[in-house]
Structure formats: C-alpha cells, structure tokens
C-alpha cells in the first residue's frame, strides 16, 4: 500500500458588527489515514464565553455540513448525529480557543473546516 495523506483546510468565519472580532486558525493540516487531528480556532475581540462556537465542514464541490457547536461558557455541546462518533468539541477558556478533534481519519474527512461564531 502506498503512502497517502489527508488534507484538512482550516478557515475561520465570524459574524457581528465589530470589525475587531477575529477567529484564527493555523492553516492546512496534513495527516495520515487512521490518525487523529485536533483543529484549533482562537477567538479575539469579544467575550469568548458569551457566544456558541460552531464547526462546519465543506468537501470539494459540495455544500456545507454543520458538525456541531459548543458553549464556551459551560462546555455544553450539540452534535450532528453524522459526526458524533468522529468529532469531539472542546474549549480552553484561558486562551479563548475552541477545538475540534477528528478521529480515525479517512479520505472522506479531507475537507475545509470552518469555525464560526
């Protein structure tokens, strides 16, 4: 079996009237099938614990799929049933960062992943 990889593109999106609101993600991740990856989304310019953080997936040529969301204030989560066994959402309040961990990666996980407030 030849070497293969999975490419995950990370994009942040924020809504609101204040231009200083930012969600920052580190960029492209290159991982091997079967591995796990933890994607980060660092928030700034607003009170992190006051807004739910959403994660969305988009495969090439396809529409957006809502993965789930997390309440940074209390850690409460909601998941799309499709992703429940694939994804774990967490936050670190001290660094105002949201995370999504994807496990047992396959070619179907190669996509653009958005975090959105």
Swiss-Prot record:
Signal peptide positions on this chain: 1-19
List the PANTHER family hit by this protein, alphabetically.
IMMUNOGLOBULIN HEAVY CHAIN
Q: Where is this region: Complementarity-determining-1?
A: 50-54
Give the molecular function GO annotations: antigen binding
- What does the entry list under GO cellular component? extracellular region; immunoglobulin complex
Q: Which UniProt keywords apply?
A: Adaptive immunity, Disulfide bond, Immunity, Immunoglobulin, Signal
Natural source organism: Mus musculus (Mouse)
Q: List the disulfide bonds.
A: 41-115
Where are the stretches annotated Complementarity-determining-2? 69-85
Instruction: Give any extra note attached to this record.
Output: This germline gene belongs to a set of closely related genes that could encode V regions of NPb antibodies.
Keyword Transferase (UniProt): no
Task: Output the Gene3D superfamilies linked to this UniProt entry.
Answer: Immunoglobulins (2.60.40.10)
Q: What is this protein called?
A: Ig heavy chain V region 23
Give positions of region: Framework-2. Answer: 55-68
Q: Which residue stretches belong to region Framework-1?
A: 20-49
One biological process term in Gene Ontology = immunoglobulin mediated immune response
Q: Where is this region: Framework-3?
A: 86-117
* InterPro entries, per the entry: Ig-like_dom (IPR007110), Ig-like_dom_sf (IPR036179), Ig-like_fold (IPR013783), Ig_V-set (IPR013106), IgHV (IPR050199)
- SUPFAM superfamilies for this protein: Immunoglobulin
């Amino acid at each position: 079996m030849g070497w293969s990889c999975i490419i995950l593109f990370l994009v942040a999106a924020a809504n609101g009237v204040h231009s200083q609101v930012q969600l920052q993600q580190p960029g492209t991740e290159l991982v091997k099938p079967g591995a796990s990856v933890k994607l980060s989304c660092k928030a700034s310019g607003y009170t992190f614990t006051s807004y739910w953080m959403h994660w969305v997936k988009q495969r090439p040529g396809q529409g957006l799929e809502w993965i789930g969301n997390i309440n940074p204030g209390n850690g409460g989560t909601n998941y799309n049933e499709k992703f429940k066994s694939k994804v774990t959402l967490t936050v670190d309040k001290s660094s105002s960062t949201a995370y999504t961990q994807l496990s047992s990666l396959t070619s179907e996980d190669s996509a653009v992943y958005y975090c959105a407030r």
